[in-house]
């Protein structure tokens, strides 16, 4: 038998295709207080960035909840988070704030426009909603609108109106959702969302058959606001194109975009 009398190097080949990477498969659940997000229902969260996006960044009263959830996400990638249902309220465009805990709460109590809080409400309870502003612009106000450059062209007549022979309906709107005070982005009046060429008509459709009624489009696509009622300046909003004369022209914003700043949202992290 031979021996090495001085230090040496032993070479060994390893087939890396046989190595199984470590992948976390743990599923966790956590309920706590957060600044934003749906209340009372489980939401899947896969990372700390995802947690912040869906439930907001921590403040001085909910930081324990936030960092407890974040600690799990350092080692796992499937956490079901439930925002505890507290007395927090949603910011609204006018009147007294209301509580819209989640999408089911909205559908059951507010979808038909029975909120009496103006045209818009924050998607979820919390003071973050107080930084939201919604602007709605029809064709008559587009040329002077501060956010006109965010869209390819002025709103006009929808394809549904054209197909029904209401060729001058001017039923379309452009909508922007803004971070008015900078609470979301750190910069005041940052654009958070845009909705282009949506219609005031309840029966307006896209070419693929989906609704192009502005209420439906915003409710389905916005991460920040719910539709609550038609603004008083949009007197024709919600009517059906199929019931109109071919000469019908929708009453838009009167030459100036309609702006709604939300307020009244409150936090409540006690649960």
Outline where the language-model segments fall.
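Surface-exposed assembly/interface segments
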Residues: 1-271
């Amino acid at each position: 038998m031979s021996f090495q009398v001085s230090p040496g190097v032993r070479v060994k080949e390893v087939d890396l295709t046989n190595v199984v990477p470590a992948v976390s498969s743990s599923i966790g659940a956590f309920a706590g207080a957060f600044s934003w997000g749906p209340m009372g229902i489980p939401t899947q969260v896969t990372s700390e960035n995802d947690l912040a996006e869906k439930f907001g960044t921590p403040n001085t009263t909910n930081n324990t909840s936030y960092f407890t959830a974040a600690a799990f996400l350092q080692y796992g990638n499937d956490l079901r988070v439930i925002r505890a249902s507290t007395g927090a309220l949603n910011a609204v465009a006018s009147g007294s704030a209301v509580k819209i805990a989640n999408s089911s709460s909205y559908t059951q109590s507010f979808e038909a426009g029975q909120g009496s809080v103006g045209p818009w409400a924050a998607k979820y309870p919390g003071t973050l909603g107080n930084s939201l502003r919604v602007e709605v612009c029809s064709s008559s106000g587009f040329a002077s609108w501060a956010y006109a450059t965010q869209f390819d062209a002025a709103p006009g007549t929808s394809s549904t109106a054209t197909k029904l022979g209401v060729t001058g309906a001017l039923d379309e709107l452009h909508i922007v959702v803004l971070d008015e005070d900078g609470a979301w982005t750190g910069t005041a009046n940052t654009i958070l969302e845009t909705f282009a060429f949506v219609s005031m008509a309840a029966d307006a459709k896209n070419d693929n058959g989906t609704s192009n009624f502005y209420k439906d489009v915003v409710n389905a696509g916005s991460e920040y606001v719910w539709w609550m009622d038609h603004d008083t300046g949009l007197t024709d909003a919600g009517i059906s194109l199929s019931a109109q004369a071919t000469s019908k022209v929708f009453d838009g914003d009167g030459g100036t975009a309609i702006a709604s700043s939300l307020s009244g949202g409150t936090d409540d992290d006690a649960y």
